[in-house]
């Protein structure tokens, strides 16, 4: 494969920096909603996708090469790894590969296809806790026990959370909101690309 299809050192630095900015924005966006579980689930992740859509468009227009789509979710996933959420990191590592595969074969020449990895990233972000409870419930119970809870109390605590995180209607709302706002963010970024980024020579 032609070497120009891969990120060079300068582009790698740009992607790493902007991916870190996306992660920081996601964390800051969630802070005002931290006390309200419903707003975190239904709104915070979509808002992060909306705001980060502008940065994402700039990123993929400046660095439309193999490696870009892998790095974006991996950086976000590493945050979860460092904070002890190993399973969520694993989800984002898988998504990093999926997003990269989606963009192979001329994906960056399309105006539509780049929106898919962006939407998937923030949809997965909305589903992090849901998937962890669904797939690794026993491990969660054991983590509560390790913190000093007895097994019955730990199981009851997880069960109380499952009623919210695993409710089908809540999952549907969270996914729809994250997808819609992320796509809106991408569309806003594309609009700004023509009006501001290109005239300014940024992209």
Residue ranges and their predicted role:
Residues 1-4, 190-203:
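Short, charged juxtamembrane terminal tails flanking transmembrane helices
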Residues 18-29, 48, 52, 56, ...:
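Alpha-helical transmembrane segments of multipass membrane proteins
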Residues 118-194:
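Membrane-embedded alpha-helical hairpins and interfacial helices in multi-pass inner-membrane proteins
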Residues 33-41, 103-112, 194-201:
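Membrane interface segments of multi-pass transport proteins and intramembrane proteases
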Residues 2-71:
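Hydrophobic transmembrane alpha-helices
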Residues 30, 34, 75-103:
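Interfacial aromatic-anchored transmembrane helix boundaries in multi-pass membrane proteins
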